[in-house]
Amino acid sequence: MATSSAASVDMEDIQTVDLMSELLRRMKCASKPDKRLVFIGPPGSGKGTQSPVIKDEFCLCHLSTGDMLRAAVAAKTPLGVKAKEAMDKGELVSDDLVVGIMDEAMNRPKCQKGFILDGFPRTVTQAEKLDEMLNRRGAQIDKVLNFAIDDSVLEERITGRWIHPSSGRSYHTKFAPPKVPGVDDLTGEPLIQRKDDNADVLRSRLDAFHKQTQPVIDYYAKKENLVNIPAEKAPEEVTKVVKKVVST
């Protein structure tokens, strides 16, 4: 009885509008098919732009390894405690621990209809361990979306970015220039470039990405669930392609 009472009190503390919104969301999602997706792509390829759109459209949860690790550590779950011990020693969290934490995260109600994995797997070993875990759940990855884009296009996209530091407003010298070069439109304050938004840093990051990720792309290509997304297109065009791919 105590457990029931505690649960009742918790529910009573939730605003009616929040309860209704969640009930409506779950009713809308009930008829959606399950989808288990992996998004792969280099920095600047648009994965981060597309993930929330697809998450909401198909009632999926977005699983980021960094967010999951932080949540498990904060909640002091058994796996979170082990992960914290490794991090405190300056060690990398093992693939088995990461996949275990991911397995726990997939039990949440918001992951009922499936998930988008972003930033994982990064290696073939991780991909294999992910498959093993999903097999134990009687599931598998449905689609792997590779946001394919030429490095030269990425360089133009990223090195042209300028930021207004206090507001976060972003500009681009070619695609979305400020009214006055180097100056924020609203405040007249100077714009800055992030340290990582330069050609040398980008080339280094892209080189590391290609070396690390190409074997993963090949792994999924052999499983015939890999789809290349033309990520050089405008975001709204990419969204149309991604929705079509995920829907089929």
Swiss-Prot record:
Keywords, A to Z? Answer: Acetylation, ATP-binding, Cytoplasm, Kinase, Nucleotide-binding, Transferase
Q: Name one GO molecular function term.
A: adenylate kinase activity
Q: In the record, which positions carry N-acetylalanine? A: A2
Catalytic activity, reaction form: AMP + ATP = 2 ADP
Primary location class? cytoplasm
Residues annotated as binding AMP: T65, R70, E91, L92, V93, G119, F120, P121, R122, Q126, R194, R205
Family annotation (PANTHER family): NUCLEOTIDE KINASE (PTHR23359)
Protein name, entry field: Adenylate kinase 3
Organism equals Arabidopsis thaliana
Instruction: Recite the lineage of the species.
Output: Eukaryota, Viridiplantae, Streptophyta, Embryophyta, Tracheophyta
Designated gene of the protein: ADK2
